[in-house]
């Protein structure tokens, strides 16, 4: 080591399964992330190296220690507290699934299939070999979102929401080959007088929440009643002509299927004063929503009451994702930010520590079950960004799903892969730890 090299006192901490003994280390200030990661691995004597990133005062270290200290005014006599976290592998494209229509929502939660909904009103299922195993016309207008209610072997009960002013409960069977797959609309949910923007099933699959541009949130059970709970709407001459066209056009979805039971809501939640853009479950009895009225609201679903309102000045919200364990919510808005909120208070987790800037409007956000801190956003500039909420200055990684200016409209992050939906169809990328994605990666790469 060069005698002129200075050292910095460092204390390490971590929330990973790889803690170091509590002691002070004298680290050469010329060291970067790679050197620190080597130090941790050697000190722990790990049989298989584990790559780490390092957080210094809420910022991921991307320079030498000396450069970081100079930029932040930290002297050599001070002791740096550095937290290390497991590194996220560089994003790697696994597969692409072309669509003729824009993809509005995507799910990576099924072990053997990817699900998408699109602006043509269809729900589609793809196996890991990129085969279409189901193509179901469910709605007569673009589907805005969907949620898996329950499953048994290859049969799934799903809920969908649409711009056709309705939501639905459907049952699908995913078979091999496609001819053995099937779908059936079980019930249509009738409440809203404007497009239904989102739908969410609770973890037990017993209740649903719907949000709409009419400012209302509907609470529904998922049982299918023996008879209709809502009268059939009056059909005008124009509606009759449209219905006749649908009978001869199998590609047109029809939420008014004669076999579907018309359901009424259990409760209607009222508090928003503008479009509600997204709703989600926070607990078995609590919901959370965001809207164009620049508010984030929590709900006591059983009592039908708004329990907390978080207001943000001129910040119309487009999407949200919740972390149930931490009782936090991440929102994306038209002011080109993602913001982290503690739902136990009425404020963001401080303006400095809670906002994540984007160069273009972020349209969607998703958390991952594998981490309490990692999150992915998709934006109208076509860029997907992976973040660690402990570091607000820059994304961990970013990549373009498609060439050109195609917008990202939906993201999902499960089992170490990110599903990306939008104007370019569906793309699936490997983003995560090696052991999370190994099996899926091999299967997807064989089919690429």
Curated annotation (Swiss-Prot):
Principal place of residence: nucleus
Q: Which GO terms describe its molecular function?
A: ribonucleoprotein complex binding
GO BP, sorted A to Z: maturation of 5.8S rRNA from tricistronic rRNA transcript (SSU-rRNA, 5.8S rRNA, LSU-rRNA); maturation of LSU-rRNA from tricistronic rRNA transcript (SSU-rRNA, 5.8S rRNA, LSU-rRNA)
Q: Where are the WD repeats?
A: 98-136, 191-230, 271-309, 312-351, 357-397, 403-439
Q: Which PROSITE patterns match?
A: WD_REPEATS_1, WD_REPEATS_2, WD_REPEATS_REGION
Q: Which UniProt keywords apply?
A: Nucleus, Repeat, Ribosome biogenesis, rRNA processing, WD repeat
Q: Indicate the secretion signal residues.
A: none
A GO term from the CC aspect:
nucleolus
Q: How does it assemble?
A: Component of the NOP7 complex, composed of ERB1, NOP7 and YTM1. The complex is held together by ERB1, which interacts with NOP7 via its N-terminal domain and with YTM1 via a high-affinity interaction between the seven-bladed beta-propeller domains of the 2 proteins. The NOP7 complex associates with the 66S pre-ribosome. Interacts (via UBL domain) with MDN1 (via VWFA/MIDAS domain).
Protein's job: Component of the NOP7 complex, which is required for maturation of the 25S and 5.8S ribosomal RNAs and formation of the 60S ribosome.
| Name under which the protein is recorded | Ribosome biogenesis protein YTM1
Natural source organism: Coprinopsis cinerea (strain Okayama-7 / 130 / ATCC MYA-4618 / FGSC 9003)
